[in-house]
Amino acid sequence: MSDEEHTFETADAGSSATYPMQCSALRKNGFVVIKSRPCKIVDMSTSKTGKHGHAKVHLVAIDIFTGKKLEDLSPSTHNMEVPVVKRNEYQLLDIDDGFLSLMNMDGDTKDDVKAPEGELGDSLQTAFDEGKDLMVTIISAMGEEAAISFKEAARTD
């Protein structure tokens, strides 16, 4: 055994931020990429095969980061990109300069997530100012991250 210390950099092994899926296999409440944005499908309908061509799938989806509504119409046999979406919970340490200071279960800190805007941001700030121990849910897809919800951490008394 050697006494040398080894440090290993973590990497994503070159994995893609999306994967292909046939239109007909997409489902409501699933995720899809429309206009290069990761979206959650809120409504979908299929039109019958016409005289020329394939059955079409009409998708209505909401951008998971901006909340904007996007629509797409595509043949059911075509492939669409589906984003790899991850949800992680972090303990909130601080809110500083519009950014959240977070800690994961391993004790690693993360300071690059923007504080949410609007009602969620206001209620998060209020709960934090009241001294509550908070867990924040962060959703990440296609290189973007955002806080989508928070809850009071369970007490371990």
UniProtKB/Swiss-Prot annotation:
Changing D63V: Impairs programmed ribosomal frameshifting. Changing V57D: Temperature-sensitive growth phenotype. GO terms for cellular component: cytoplasm; cytosol; mitochondrion; perinuclear region of cytoplasm. The keyword ATP-binding does not apply. There is a cross-link at K86 (Glycyl lysine isopeptide (Lys-Gly) (interchain with G-Cter in ubiquitin)). The modification N-acetylserine is found at S2. Changing S149P: In ts1159; temperature-sensitive growth phenotype and impairs programmed ribosomal frameshifting. Impaired ability to promote efficient translation of polyproline-containing peptides that stall ribosomes. It comes from the Eukaryota. Gene3D superfamilies: 2.30.30.30, Nucleic acid-binding proteins. GO terms for biological process: CAT tailing; cytoplasmic translational elongation; cytoplasmic translational elongation through polyproline stretches; cytoplasmic translational termination; positive regulation of cytoplasmic translational elongation through polyproline stretches; positive regulation of translational elongation; positive regulation of translational initiation; positive regulation of translational termination. One of its GO terms (molecular function) is translation initiation factor activity. Translation factor that promotes translation elongation and termination, particularly upon ribosome stalling at specific amino acid sequence contexts. Binds between the exit (E) and peptidyl (P) site of the ribosome and promotes rescue of stalled ribosome: specifically required for efficient translation of polyproline-containing peptides as well as other motifs that stall the ribosome. Acts as a ribosome quality control (RQC) cofactor by joining the RQC complex to facilitate peptidyl transfer during CAT tailing step. Homodimer. Binds to 80S ribosomes. Actively translating ribosomes show mutually exclusive binding of eIF5a (HYP2 or ANB1) and EFT1/eEF2. Interacts with DYS1 and LIA1. Belongs to the eIF-5A family. This is Eukaryotic translation initiation factor 5A-1. It comes from Saccharomyces cerevisiae (strain ATCC 204508 / S288c).
